[in-house]
Design a protein with these regions (language model features):
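A glycine- and charged-residue-rich anion-binding loop/surface
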Residues: 1-237
Length: 237
């Protein structure tokens, strides 16, 4: 093996042999066992002879739908592939979350969902998509998974509406937010700064609905970091 990406762990073995009393003392268990954990999609990678989870047939069909909607080619550019994979992963996760009763919001699990959808929308923007499109991928996600998760089909229209509404809401602010982000970024760079202020990150969140991890990703693309501690403090005020 190596520390590179050449190999993927398909499963692992956990040897349950000792009991930890919480104070650093270990004693042997009377009953020992070996626990095996295996990732289903990682197993599919090995069985199908593909390079990654994103190349497994059921996942690739979702990516193919994304490429059809965006016009982007998969496998030609690392940067493009990252965006396609982010969109594929996030819309799949979002579909299941909404089916399970989660709605986009600014707190708790609803905020996780909002962050997923808005990050995916931003990557669509990077691929040149200027209008809502994620909702059109929902049907493919459902088609690939309804055999084992039949309730997805029952809630298909509802899931699609939720995704489309969230996309449309973000679309109203993303262009203005990107413009302000560019201006704020230029100000930091003009001063030779490498840290994007928490106050500016909060402004993007509070005014334009940019989740902190979305801002952090955009800042990282520019070789900078975000003062997330200052952002968190402003969130608490």
């Amino acid at each position: 093996g190596c520390d590179c990406d050449r190999y993927m762990e398909v499963w692992n073995n956990v040897f349950s042999q000792f009991d930890n009393d919480g104070h650093g003392h270990y004693s042997e268990l009377a009953q020992k066992n070996i626990d095996t954990g295996m990732g289903l999609e990682r197993l599919a990678v090995a069985c199908q002879g593909v390079e990654s989870l994103f190349d497994v047939d059921t996942v690739m069909n979702i990516t193919n739908r994304v490429t059809a909607l965006t016009g982007a080619a998969y496998g030609q550019s690392h940067k493009t592939d990252v965006s396609l994979r982010v969109i594929t992963d996030h819309i799949r996760s979002a579909t299941f979350m909404i089916a399970d009763g989660v709605l986009p919001s600014n707190e708790g699990r609803g905020y996780v969902l909002r962050r997923l959808l808005r990050r995916a929308a931003r990557h669509g923007k990077l691929l040149g998509v200027d209008k809502p499109f994620l909702f059109q991928v929902v049907e493919t996600v459902i088609h690939e998974n309804e055999g084992h998760y039949g309730y997805l089909r029952d809630r298909a229209d509802y899931i699609t509406r939720v995704v489309r509404t969230e996309e449309e809401n973000f679309a109203r602010t993303i262009d203005g937010g990107m413009k302000i982000f560019a201006e704020l970024l230029a100000e930091h760079k003009a001063k030779g700064e490498t840290v994007f202020s928490g106050a500016d990150a909060f402004k993007l969140y509070d005014t334009y609905g940019f989740p902190i991890d979305l801002t952090a990703e955009m800042v990282e693309d520019e070789g900078m970091t975000v003062d997330e501690a200052a952002f968190a403090k402003l969130m608490q005020e």
